[in-house]
């Protein structure tokens, strides 16, 4: 069996990679993917801790987090497509949707 610390280390590395993606990239689609990577790394850590405690509640919470993340992606991508159709760019520095 793989030790719990390996899963936590993998989760931390994935979360760090997601944070680096959010900080360095300006493409809205890449930002969405980086945020999803961060959510999935948090899910991995939560499942790891639930597995270590032999508790199913952590896995149930992760299931609901995945459902909410899927809804977030659907709304976010719909907004991104609408913005791309009007502005013809996905660069977050050039998108000023509130300015009109």
From Swiss-Prot:
An example of a Gene Ontology cellular component annotation for this protein is: plasma membrane
Question: What are its GO biological-process terms?
Answer: ATP synthesis coupled electron transport
- Is Disulfide bond there in the keyword field? no
Catalytic activity line of the entry: a quinone + NADH + 5 H(+)(in) = a quinol + NAD(+) + 4 H(+)(out)
Q: Where are the transmembrane segments?
A: 3-23, 29-49, 60-80
Q: What is its EC number?
A: 7.1.1.-
**Class of the enzyme per the UniProt entry, highest EC level:** translocase
> Which GO MF terms does the UniProt record name?
NADH:ubiquinone reductase (non-electrogenic) activity; quinone binding
The record's section on Pfam families has: Oxidored_q2
Give the bilayer topology. Answer: Multi-pass membrane protein
Keyword Ribosomal protein in record: no
Which keywords does the record carry?
Cell membrane, Membrane, NAD, Quinone, Translocase, Transmembrane, Transmembrane helix, Transport, Ubiquinone
- Location of the protein in the cell: Cell membrane
User: Which family, according to the similarity comment?
Assistant: Belongs to the complex I subunit 4L family.
Q: What does this protein do?
A: NDH-1 shuttles electrons from NADH, via FMN and iron-sulfur (Fe-S) centers, to quinones in the respiratory chain. The immediate electron acceptor for the enzyme in this species is believed to be ubiquinone. Couples the redox reaction to proton translocation (for every two electrons transferred, four hydrogen ions are translocated across the cytoplasmic membrane), and thus conserves the redox energy in a proton gradient.
Q: How does it assemble?
A: NDH-1 is composed of 14 different subunits. Subunits NuoA, H, J, K, L, M, N constitute the membrane sector of the complex.
UniProt-listed PANTHER family: NADH DEHYDROGENASE SUBUNIT 4L-RELATED, NADH-UBIQUINONE OXIDOREDUCTASE SUBUNIT ND4L
- The name under which this protein is listed is NADH-quinone oxidoreductase subunit K
- Give the lineage: Bacteria, Bacillati, Chloroflexota, Chloroflexia, Chloroflexales
Q: Which gene encodes it?
A: nuoK
């Amino acid at each position: 069996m793989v030790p719990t610390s390996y899963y936590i280390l993998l989760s931390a590395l994935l979360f760090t990679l997601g944070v680096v993606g959010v900080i360095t990239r300006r493409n809205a689609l890449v930002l969405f993917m980086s945020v999803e990577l961060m959510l999935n790394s948090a899910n991995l850590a939560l499942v790891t801790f639930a597995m270590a405690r032999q508790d199913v509640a952590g896995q149930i919470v992760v299931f609901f987090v995945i459902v909410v993340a899927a809804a977030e992606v659907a709304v976010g991508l719909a907004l991104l497509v609408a913005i791309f159709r009007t502005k013809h760019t996905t660069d977050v520095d050039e998108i000023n949707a509130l300015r009109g």
